[in-house]
Curated annotation (Swiss-Prot):
It holds the Pfam family Utp8_C. One of its GO terms (cellular component) is rDNA heterochromatin. The lineage of its organism: Eukaryota, Fungi, Dikarya, Ascomycota, Saccharomycotina. The modification Phosphothreonine is found at T95. Keywords: Nucleus, Phosphoprotein, Ribonucleoprotein, Ribosome biogenesis, rRNA processing, Transcription. Its main location: nucleus. The gene is UTP8. This is U3 small nucleolar RNA-associated protein 8.
């Protein structure tokens, strides 16, 4: 179930000049992307004017490592990654000559390290890029008493050393984004002047790529099918922005640049200033003036605009807003001290929490998870909280998040969209003007001559009671004509029939006047009514068992059917179609725990008969008779049956059939997975291959000229 926990404190921010402006704290505290995920226990942050710090979360939040920086330095970008790197070192080794001289030998040793890279701004126009190599705490070196030139263990670097290496260079412009590639030992810095520079871990410049714009404001790296991509946004005049998509290719391709431009587009009406941006799973989200604009990649086309009622009346400068993604179509939004978990697909507020102990809470970073492809629905986010009072203090706090199941079920009844007040006060007419007659009551408050029907319950009951037994035709004529019902099943136009007492009396007359051989069409209508009386659902299935059409209708549409009766019918029926209907109804209406508890009360013989029917491979029950969705449905129900009774209660022959059935299901799942991966790979290649891959040409071939597109938004 979607939920937001109460945040807990990680550390208190220092009271320094660079952090005195609370509205800019989120820009002056940078969180390293590389090591921040839903299961991390280490968080690396760059705190402007203070230090590059590393904290652990469990069992008790505390500072584990700290690299101080001058109080006048502002951190513009920060990242960290764990991996292996070649560490240089010098040792003194004796030679075999007569003078017994010593010479210095340069050595390299590959070690498990942590790479920290960050950009600093000392003052406007003075920028630096820094790389620190830090030994992991569990890294140890094997000692060797006998040193040789071919196999020398450098004793100078041990697990207790603070840093293995430190490098610093002057940057040509403000560092906006940093990516660390531990596989190829690279640091990729994206600068505000439009340069993308690639360094090794010693900050030796290897490649440089110019995007031709000197006002880069946003850059985001993402991975698709093992390939790294980055898109950048450069604001232009007249609310225009330049969008560029680039690919990071194999860095070992020689002298050619590993950065390749895939597309470039000028987007009009983007309004970059005062906007909050975030990206997840192929979509770019922009929050501006109470509206969120959703752009789809790779062409950055506007897909949807959603209005947020919780932020549309805010005064700029008075309230602090932050915005971060957490899962597919789900984002976190904070307005002052209120946190919202939003579903942008169904426009709903899944959960919200007001932090009464603080004045504001600003999100810094969230760990994005794909809850559609994994069973994990829990993640974390880190932010800055500021307390009330004359001397407010700010703290780093972590919040635990449950994003839910990513289905419509999470959003039912939680929409944040506000309807029109005029249309919500007065009900709209259910019927056209031509249906108005003397038995309708005019609604003068509604524009036109709209009306709603009047329900004369007592008159209808009296007329139905006066009929003779088994007079099906007269019963249906009175019921449908008196109530102005046009269909034999419930529709939205029948909403005015909402009296449970009236429905109960009609059912009493039906079961009292008609035998079990045949029933009027009125019963079909009532079985589709969402207000079917709860008291009448008991023993309803057994009463309708001899009427196949009504029996199936009750299973599919009648609300509030008891679970125990559904299970009894499920374990006694030998019809494939009804078996699927009942199983779908059970899985849809009841929880797994309640199903298992009720199964334990049933006879083991009935349960075994059900398992035998499913796994025996007969004409009506073999896996080949079901489509993939039906087979998955029965497989899920079968797992609940096995959980409730246990495998030890089954006999040998039944276990063999069950094993064969499960093997077939696993084989189908493996085959479907392979096909899905093939389709997914081919689909992605068709999306990007036109400008990225060319199997018939060399990697050194020049890129085709890109096109400029102007979009009217």
């Amino acid at each position: 179930m979607p939920s937001l926990s109460q945040p807990f404190r990680l550390a208190t921010l220092p009271k320094i000049a660079s952090l005195s402006n609370f509205s800019l704290q989120a820009d002056y505290v940078q969180v390293a992307d590389g090591t921040f995920n839903e299961s991390t226990n280490n968080i690396t942050l760059g705190i402007s004017g203070s230090s590059i710090s590393q904290y652990i979360i469990n069992p008790t939040p505390k500072l584990t490592f700290d690299y101080p920086i001058p109080s006048t330095n502002i951190i513009t970008a920060c990242n960290a990654e764990k991996g292996q790197a070649n560490i240089d070192g010098n040792i003194e080794a004796s030679t075999d000559d007569e003078a017994n001289n010593e010479k210095t030998i340069n050595t390299q040793k590959k070690r498990n390290v942590e790479i920290w890279a960050f950009g600093l701004m000392v003052n406007k126009g003075n920028y630096t890029l820094n790389v620190i190599t830090k030994a992991l705490e569990d890294t140890t070196d094997t000692s060797n008493d006998h040193l040789s030139e071919s196999d020398i263990d450098n004793k100078a670097y041990t697990g207790s050393d603070e840093f293995l290496s430190q490098y610093k260079i002057k940057a040509k412009a403000k560092v906006m984004s940093i990516k660390i590639d531990t596989k190829n030992s690279l640091v990729i810095a994206i600068l505000q002047n439009g340069l993308i520079e690639i360094f090794d871990f010693k900050l030796t410049l290897l490649h440089s790529f110019d995007i031709s714009y000197d006002n880069l404001k946003y850059a985001k790296w993402f991975t698709e099918n093992g390939t790294e991509y980055v898109f950048v946004l450069c604001p232009l005049q007249d609310d225009k922005v330049c969008y560029k998509l680039l690919e990071l290719t194999d860095c070992g391709s020689g002298e050619s640049s590993p950065i390749k431009e895939l597309s470039s587009t000028i987007i009009e009406g983007f309004s970059f200033e005062n906007s909050k941006l975030c990206y997840q799973f192929g979509k770019l989200y922009k929050l501006n003036q109470g509206k969120i604009y959703i752009y789809s990649l790779p062409h950055c086309q506007l897909q949807q605009v959603i209005e947020f009622p919780m932020v549309d009346k805010l005064s700029p400068g008075d309230d602090l807003i932050s915005f971060q993604p957490v899962s597919v179509n789900r984002v976190l939004l904070t307005v002052n001290n209120v946190i919202y978990l939003l579903d942008l697909l169904h426009c709903s507020t899944l959960s919200q929490r007001e932090l009464t102990h603080v004045k504001t809470f600003q999100l810094l970073k969230s760990a994005v998870i794909n809850s559609e492809k994994s069973h994990n629905s829990k993640t974390i986010a880190i932010g800055i909280s500021t307390k009330n009072g004359p001397n407010p203090t700010s703290s780093l706090e972590i919040i635990n998040i449950d994003v839910g199941t990513n289905t419509l079920k999470d959003s039912l009844g939680k929409s944040f969209q506000v309807g029109n007040n005029d249309s919500s006060v007065i009900l709209k007419p259910l019927f056209d003007d031509k249906d108005i007659n003397d038995k309708r009551v005019k609604c003068n408050d509604v524009s036109g001559d709209s009306s709603v029907p009047v329900l004369h319950c007592n008159e209808v009951i009296e007329k139905l009671s006066a009929l003779q037994d088994n007079d099906i035709t007269s019963f249906d004529d009175i019921f449908f004509k008196e109530l102005k019902i046009k269909e034999e099943h419930y529709t939205e136009k029948d909403r005015y029939i909402s009296d449970p007492g009236f429905l109960n009396k009609v059912l009493d007359l039906i079961f009292g006047k008609f035998s079990g051989n045949d029933y009027p069409k009125t019963l079909t209508f009532l079985l589709t009514h969402p207000l079917f009386p709860l008291s009448r659902t008991r023993n309803l299935l057994s009463l309708l068992r001899d009427q196949p059409r009504l029996f199936k209708q009750a299973i599919v549409t009648c609300p509030n059917l008891p679970l125990n009766e559904l299970l009894e019918e499920l374990f006694s029926i030998r019809n494939r179609e009804l078996l699927l209907d009942i199983s779908f109804r059970i899985l849809q209406d009841f929880t797994r725990d309640s199903i298992k508890q009720e199964m334990k009360k049933l006879s083991k013989l009935d349960v075994q008969n059900f398992i035998e029917f499913i796994t025996s491979g007969g004409e009506d029950s073999s896996p080949e008779c079901f489509n993939p969705s039906q087979s998955t449905q029965l497989f899920q129900l079968l797992s609940l049956v096995l959980d409730s009774i246990g495998l030890f209660s089954l006999e040998g022959a039944l276990l063999e059939n069950l094993t064969l059935y499960i093997d077939k299901q696993v084989e189908i799942a493996e085959r479907n997975t392979e096909l899905w991966n093939l389709i997914d790979t081919k689909g992605f290649q068709h999306g990007f291959a036109s400008s990225t891959f060319d199997n018939g040409t060399s990697q050194k071939r020049a890129l085709p000229t890109y096109t400029m597109e102007y979009l009217d938004i």
